[in-house]
Amino acid sequence: MLSRLFRMHGLFVASHPWEVIVGTVTLTICMMSMNMFTGNNKICGWNYECPKFEEDVLSSDIIILTITRCIAILYIYFQFQNLRQLGSKYILGIAGLFTIFSSFVFSTVVIHFLDKELTGLNEALPFFLLLIDLSRASTLAKFALSSNSQDEVRENIARGMAILGPTFTLDALVECLVIGVGTMSGVRQLEIMCCFGCMSVLANYFVFMTFFPACVSLVLELSRESREGRPIWQLSHFARVLEEEENKPNPVTQRVKMIMSLGLVLVHAHSRWIADPSPQNSTADTSKVSLGLDENVSKRIEPSVSLWQFYLSKMISMDIEQVITLSLALLLAVKYIFFEQTETESTLSLKNPITSPVVTQKKVPDNCCRREPMLVRNNQKCDSVEEETGINRERKVEVIKPLVAETDTPNRATFVVGNSSLLDTSSVLVTQEPEIELPREPRPNEECLQILGNAEKGAKFLSDAEIIQLVNAKHIPAYKLETLMETHERGVSIRRQLLSKKLSEPSSLQYLPYRDYNYSLVMGACCENVIGYMPIPVGVAGPLCLDEKEFQVPMATTEGCLVASTNRGCRAIGLGGGASSRVLADGMTRGPVVRLPRACDSAEVKAWLETSEGFAVIKEAFDSTSRFARLQKLHTSIAGRNLYIRFQSRSGDAMGMNMISKGTEKALSKLHEYFPEMQILAVSGNYCTDKKPAAINWIEGRGKSVVCEAVIPAKVVREVLKTTTEAMIEVNINKNLVGSAMAGSIGGYNAHAANIVTAIYIACGQDAAQNVGSSNCITLMEASGPTNEDLYISCTMPSIEIGTVGGGTNLLPQQACLQMLGVQGACKDNPGENARQLARIVCGTVMAGELSLMAALAAGHLVKSHMIHNRSKINLQDLQGACTKKTA
């Protein structure tokens, strides 16, 4: 119960950082203002003399106070020194903010407690610094730093608050009760010190629960820009260190603390209210007397300077003990900043070699090393490189010997996703990293697990062989390799090594690239158990003149003639004055299936859903799940006791399946409240219908419904398309209409719409499987113009399932293709416009492809063009493959 409350609190604070920070700062400033402008107007040393205070100053307490200050500074120094070992400047910065703001809040409370007397801060601040604990603050920061995105930052902060919040609350309560015992000692100086301690604990707790998590969230949001995709503050090795089980409190310790708290509460109650009910010895009065604030011993004087000058002079004036303290602080600061940074960076480097490599080029002998996948990491390498480094370490480009004979592999395919200028065919790129000596023989599993769980070491202190050993022993799940390694690429590399040993041909993966790819955008979003990426040729067709705009359309395909043919269609459309398009409907669908006790009950639910009241109830529940999802209509059908409900809703610039599914689930829960006997069988009952041929998509539409048209002049038909209008119309009727009807096609009244749709989908990061429904298209042609020699063509596509955010559109190469079309990401001015524009481009490009292919068929050029452009001229017998191998 408490964990849930703290989780909700942490999620709220992390989701609204500006509001929380402004609120806490405003509250603190208001408290400071109340201290300055209200309350007692007697200020010791300015308008009143405090003779007793002078006596206290001359006492031997100065030595003790100076020692206390020095110890406090050393304590803070060692805490920050420990934080530096974690290797993150963000933890240091956030911890510094925590310390500064906590000190500010504490100072405000102390000034209020001392009735505007600043002198008491000299005694109070050392006790505050001694009681401040940066370990919990840094732990919460590490929860946030283990995130891959801003949304995950908020979730991890909430999870951290759920784990740390109850423990910190109980610890703060126990500390206050224990330190508070000193306020009942009767010794005035001890009472004041204990009051300072209690205020220190409360100030720390207040800042930790409000300002600090909001500040962490805001700092990481402002610094979320990344190089090569990974957030610059993301530290993946924290993910395994901060498992919830390791941070959960010991239940025995918690029970002891609770029992202790109850006992201390009884002690305080007995001492304050039963044994001595009189308020004479209150701590506030005692502190005032001890600091010379008693009205009876104070004498009024005339101020010689203004109040702010008085405070400024007291801050500037320094005694010998303050000089000692300040000197120690400055010396430690200089040592920490200038002398320890180099030492720390030489022993620990947590920088991601993908995000910020320092690259040098080293010449190596020809044919000595190959840039290809490896089976054993760093055990086989060039002597020249080994002599240079003398160690085993991770490289930007790993150097190993080929897996097959060098004579069989004279050439190697090289693929780079990123800056290709860093590659040199005659050199090997080596990332300069701190030297980490790894043993040649794998160490025992127990020792490897200890290194893996050490926050200061981690996976980069283990060799690939040791990681594989841990995977085989089931200590590391194979699917978690990317999150546990210091880089995602190394996790992919190790998985390839594991897989290669299980394949009949160990060198099968040598032509499947995996290096220089931003896997941080893939993990948790696009693919699992990654072993590489598939480079697909991307061509461009265009310019496509559509709606008085020109588009260069990217197409990823391995089918020859496709891009060239589409490009010819684009040219014909452009010479004819361009094409026009309209979006007829926009609504993604999800069709769950529910069951009721009887068919008549299903009919009653269907009738209720068709009423305005029922639709309004369901729409309210559905729309509450997203700021983009807006339920448009419901389409219901009955099959016996089963009721199929087709939800149709807009989804902004997202394709929308996940968004609509979430709304559908909430709507079904609301429907269940009205019909408790209803049983939800599946959130998808194939009534959507997704990734399957279905007449309902062809008739009702799904996603974006688009129509596109163009008029091609007779001259362009003859000179560019090399045929006649009459011939194209004849082929279109008998092929696309009659032929498809004879085949019983559903939505397939076209020549090859799926070709263009799939090529654009792959290039632009769409779900390629959705070409099944998205390729529904009817192509119509007819004669037009004054002499009926011009060609009018139209393509109607009622179910284009497409989006510009989410899924594969987050990958950088796919984003580049979307940027070519000017539709990358979400449209801020008109949500959903980018996705609709992309759907119009798809329809227009399909029309261009239809135009060119139909012309080729009418002219009899299809086979001839494919023989020229779609046949490989390479002698396959010269290549080594699964079925055709050269004999020895």
UniProtKB/Swiss-Prot annotation:
Alphabetical list of SUPFAM superfamilies matching this protein = Multidrug efflux transporter AcrB transmembrane domain, NAD-binding domain of HMG-CoA reductase, Substrate-binding domain of HMG-CoA reductase
Where does the secretion signal sit in this chain?
Answer: none
Where CoA is bound, by residue? S565, T566, N567, R568, G569, C570, R571, V720, L721, K722, S865, H866
Q: How does it assemble?
A: Homotetramer. Homodimer. Interacts (via its SSD) with INSIG1; the interaction, accelerated by sterols, leads to the recruitment of HMGCR to AMFR/gp78 for its ubiquitination by the sterol-mediated ERAD pathway. Interacts with UBIAD1.
Indicate whether Acetylation appears among the record's keywords.
no
PTM description: N-glycosylated. Deglycosylated by NGLY1 on release from the endoplasmic reticulum (ER) in a sterol-mediated manner. Undergoes sterol-mediated ubiquitination and ER-associated degradation (ERAD). Accumulation of sterols in the endoplasmic reticulum (ER) membrane, triggers binding of the reductase to the ER membrane protein INSIG1 or INSIG2. The INSIG1 binding leads to the recruitment of the ubiquitin ligase, AMFR/gp78, RNF139 or RNF145, initiating ubiquitination of the reductase. The ubiquitinated reductase is then extracted from the ER membrane and delivered to cytosolic 26S proteosomes by a mechanism probably mediated by the ATPase Valosin-containing protein VCP/p97.
Implicated disorder: Muscular dystrophy, limb-girdle, autosomal recessive 28: An autosomal recessive form of limb girdle muscular dystrophy, a group of genetically heterogeneous muscular disorders that share proximal muscle weakness as the major attribute. Most limb girdle muscular dystrophies present with elevated creatinine kinase and myopathic electromyographic features. Disease is usually progressive to a variable degree, ranging from minor disability to complete inability to ambulate, and can involve the large proximal muscles, as well as axial and facial muscles.
One Pfam family, please name it. HMG-CoA_red
A single Gene Ontology MF term assigned here is: GTPase regulator activity
Cross-link Glycyl lysine isopeptide (Lys-Gly) (interchain with G-Cter in ubiquitin), where in sequence: K89, K248
Q: Which residues form the SSD domain?
A: 61-218
Phosphoserine: residues bearing it: S504, S872
Record's protein name = 3-hydroxy-3-methylglutaryl-coenzyme A reductase
Q: Its Gene Ontology biological processes? A: cholesterol biosynthetic process; coenzyme A metabolic process; isoprenoid biosynthetic process; long-term synaptic potentiation; negative regulation of amyloid-beta clearance; negative regulation of protein catabolic process; negative regulation of protein secretion; regulation of ERK1 and ERK2 cascade
Result of altering D623N: In LGMDR28; likely pathogenic; decreased hydroxymethylglutaryl-CoA reductase (NADPH) activity to 50% of wild-type activity
Q: Where is this motif: INSIG-binding motif?
A: 75-78
Q: What does this chain do?
A: Catalyzes the conversion of (3S)-hydroxy-3-methylglutaryl-CoA (HMG-CoA) to mevalonic acid, the rate-limiting step in the synthesis of cholesterol and other isoprenoids, thus plays a critical role in cellular cholesterol homeostasis. HMGCR is the main target of statins, a class of cholesterol-lowering drugs.
